[in-house]
């Protein structure tokens, strides 16, 4: 069930949507209240397009379709599915999953695991490679290079501007960051005690290109423009998700329209919440 709320079919007709009732008890509070990452996951599950794209990357990154054998995933398939998720999914919902704010380690760990880091991010190696390796691959890639340039143009500090960041760059910065997910420089949250993000790489073994390596990594780890854009989105997230709820609701009950064809997949995805 959706985070402890009871689920009831109010109306169902073949080929039409189903109106589900979520926790319709006057005065009762959802167990997800205050956990924006769970709220974002539930909102995605309730949206047919978001849920379908999410189930696709789950299948490729975590399911049998995306794994060669124990401990070995087909990373190219996983990353392709992630690119499709952000390219075709509703930005309000995909970004809510990516940038949801957390106040505790349990929420932060759920957020860190949302986009299958064992396959899409870090892989089986114990130590991260030099950032120069994925950076060089990205700059040679027709798919990755323009995405990285867009991220640099939209998120890199701009000393000449009013606040030191690109003008009105917050939403563009988040879109550009999301565009990197599924590339060879896929970023993710680094731990469950902070909101630090970076690709899976370091600069310890960078030789005489250490400065170049550090400059690239600091675009993620020490970037006030990226940090500010994420914080601004987190502040607006409740109103963003509110727009996804069906207008047929009252003070004690909220409803979601869910395709009858997506019910089983939606319930299966609850394990990821």
From Swiss-Prot:
A lipid is attached at residue 250 (GPI-anchor amidated asparagine). Residues 251-273 form a propeptide. Weakly expressed in heart, brain and testis. InterPro entries: GDNF/GAS1 (IPR016017), GDNF_alpha (IPR037193), GDNF_rcpt (IPR003438). Keywords: Cell membrane, Glycoprotein, GPI-anchor, Lipoprotein, Membrane, Receptor, Secreted, Signal. It comes from the Eukaryota. Glycans are attached at residue 192. Changing residue 257 to R: In 50% of the molecules. It holds the Pfam family GDNF. GO terms for biological process: glial cell-derived neurotrophic factor receptor signaling pathway; negative regulation of ossification; nervous system development; ossification. One of its GO terms (cellular component) is plasma membrane. GO terms for molecular function: glial cell-derived neurotrophic factor receptor activity. The keyword Lipoprotein applies. Interacts with ARTN ligand and RET: forms a 2:2:2 ternary complex composed of ARTN ligand, GFRA3 and RET receptor. Interacts with SORL1. Receptor for persephin (PSPN), a growth factor that exhibits neurotrophic activity on mesencephalic dopaminergic and motor neurons. Acts by binding to its coreceptor, GFRA4, leading to autophosphorylation and activation of the RET receptor. May be important in C-cell development and, in the postnatal development of the adrenal medulla. Belongs to the GDNFR family. This is GDNF family receptor alpha-4. The lineage of its organism: Eukaryota, Metazoa, Chordata, Craniata, Vertebrata.
């Amino acid at each position: 069930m959706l985070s402890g709320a009871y689920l009831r079919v109010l109306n169902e007709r073949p080929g039409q949507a189903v109106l589900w009732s979520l926790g319709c008890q006057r005065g009762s509070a959802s167990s997800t209240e205050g956990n924006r990452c769970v709220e974002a996951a539930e909102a995605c599950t309730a949206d047919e397009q978001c849920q379908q794209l999410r189930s696709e990357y789950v299948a490729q990154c975590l399911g049998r379709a995306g794994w060669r054998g124990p401990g070995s995933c087909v990373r190219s398939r996983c990353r392709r599915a992630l690119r499709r998720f952000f390219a075709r999914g509703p930005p309000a919902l995909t970004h809510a999953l990516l940038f949801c704010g957390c106040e505790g380690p349990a929420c932060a760990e759920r957020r860190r695991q949302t986009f299958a880091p064992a396959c899409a991010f870090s892989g089986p190696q114990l130590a991260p490679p030099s950032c120069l390796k994925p950076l060089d691959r990205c700059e040679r890639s027709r798919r990755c290079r323009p995405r990285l340039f867009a991220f640099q143009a939209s998120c890199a500090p701009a000393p000449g501007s009013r606040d030191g960041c690109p003008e009105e760059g917050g939403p563009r910065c988040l879109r550009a960051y999301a565009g990197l997910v599924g590339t060879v420089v896929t970023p993710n949250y680094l731990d469950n005690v902070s909101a630090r993000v970076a690709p899976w790489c370091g600069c310890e073994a960078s030789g005489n290109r250490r400065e170049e390596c550090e400059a690239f990594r600091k675009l993620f780890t020490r970037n006030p423009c990226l940090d500010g854009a994420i914080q601004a989105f987190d502040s607006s997230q409740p109103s963003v998700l509110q727009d996804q709820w069906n207008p047929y609701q009252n003070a004690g009950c909220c409803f979601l329209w869910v395709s009858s064809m997506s019910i089983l997949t939606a319930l299966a995805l609850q394990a990821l919440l």
